[in-house]
């Protein structure tokens, strides 16, 4: 009787049980050394000693997918936003020099549709596999009246580890370091409030539209390209001492995020035009009549991550990154800063 009354109030615990049944295989596929236990416990367990670190420092990160979820829900395509939420968290801890160990997800919804939410969690599991992290727990909260029946929100939390003497700090990068940019897959998971205003409020763009600028892709397909996860390509370089700094290009674009990886005594000089800008950004700039500053301050503009590497190590770093499947661009360098802003972007024809 209690269960029925709870269902009458809008919460179906049996749907929750069905969701757990559907995701067990996906969760199990993310197991890695150190993972302890199984899905369904009150807490997720991880054995740090099993990894053999000498002086481990734990690095944590949490994030969400933001209003990119509105695009996914309108398109009824929910299988890649889980990759996004993992990427947003694990790329952040990578910027400190850490290896992601485990991940937990949080889904809040107006109505628990087990098939739909299972597709979300399967995306989370795929992101965890790309990052080498175990999905050790999570929470699904069915909250009628808080969310519409067809709405859900998604957030996540990760913990990584680094040797204490391998941590990256703002004092690690040096003047003369070369800046290597790693290609993004598109908009990633930031700037979608501006994207939605441009396309759907200021203009009557449809997600199914295929403008010539996108070369055969629909607007929705281009916007939902999952955030790239850089762990398996960048972490080996960090462990080999080839990287002085990492900037994950998220909200605030290049202008805000590049200066976060070095101290106030340095300045990043970046050559715009030295990398490939994905078509989606040129399309958004044109439709939205955006200035260059609007773009630099909002979007990643084709660079999902920027590494500061010693000049005498750049060719070795490039070779390893290319071998791991990354598109790599030499986009600038660090110099001594006497005054002015910490980042300067100049156009190179």
Swiss-Prot record:
CDD domains associated with the record: PurM
Keywords: ATP-binding, Cytoplasm, Ligase, Nucleotide-binding, Purine biosynthesis
Family from the record: Belongs to the AIR synthase family.
UniProt enzyme class: ligase
Gene that specifies this protein: purM
Keyword ATP-binding: yes
Disulphide bonds in the chain: none
Record protein name field: Phosphoribosylformylglycinamidine cyclo-ligase
């Amino acid at each position: 009787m209690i269960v029925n009354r709870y269902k009458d109030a809008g919460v179906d615990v049996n749907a929750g049980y069905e969701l757990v049944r559907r995701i067990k295989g996906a969760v199990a596929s993310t197991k890695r050394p150190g993972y302890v236990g199984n899905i369904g416990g009150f807490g997720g367990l991880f054995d740090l000693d099993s990894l053999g670190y000498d002086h481990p420092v734990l690095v944590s990160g949490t994030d969400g997918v933001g209003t990119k979820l509105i695009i996914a829900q309108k398109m009824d395509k929910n299988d890649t936003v889980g990759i996004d939420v993992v990427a947003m968290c694990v790329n952040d801890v990578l910027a400190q020099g850490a290896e992601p160990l485990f991940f937990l997800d949080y889904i809040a919804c107006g109505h628990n549709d087990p098939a739909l939410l299972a597709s979300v969690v399967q995306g989370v599991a795929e992101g965890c596999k790309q990052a080498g992290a175990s999905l050790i727990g999570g929470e699904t909260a069915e909250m009628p009246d808080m969310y519409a029946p067809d709405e859900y929100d998604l957030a996540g939390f990760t913990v990584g580890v680094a040797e204490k003497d391998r941590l990256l700090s703002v004092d690690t990068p040096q003047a003369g370091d070369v800046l290597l940019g790693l290609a993004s897959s598109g908009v990633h998971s930031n700037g979608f409030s501006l994207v939605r205003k441009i396309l759907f409020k200021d203009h009557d763009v449809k997600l199914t539209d295929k403008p010539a600028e996108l070369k055969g892709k629909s607007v929705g397909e281009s916007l939902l390209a999952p955030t790239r996860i850089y762990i398996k390509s960048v972490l080996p370089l960090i462990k080999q001492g080839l990287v002085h700094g990492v900037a994950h290009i998220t909200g605030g674009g290049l202008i805000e995020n590049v200066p976060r990886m070095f101290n106030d005594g340095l300045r990043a000089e970046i050559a715009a035009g030295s990398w490939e800008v994905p078509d989606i950004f040129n399309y958004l700039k044109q439709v939205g009549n955006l200035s260059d500053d609007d773009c630099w301050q909002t979007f990643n503009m084709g660079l999902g991550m920027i590494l500061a590497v010693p000049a005498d190590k750049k060719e070795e770093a490039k070779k390893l990154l290319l071998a791991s499947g990354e598109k790599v661009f030499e986009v600038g360098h660090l110099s001594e800063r006497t005054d002015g802003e910490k980042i300067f972007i100049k156009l190179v024809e």
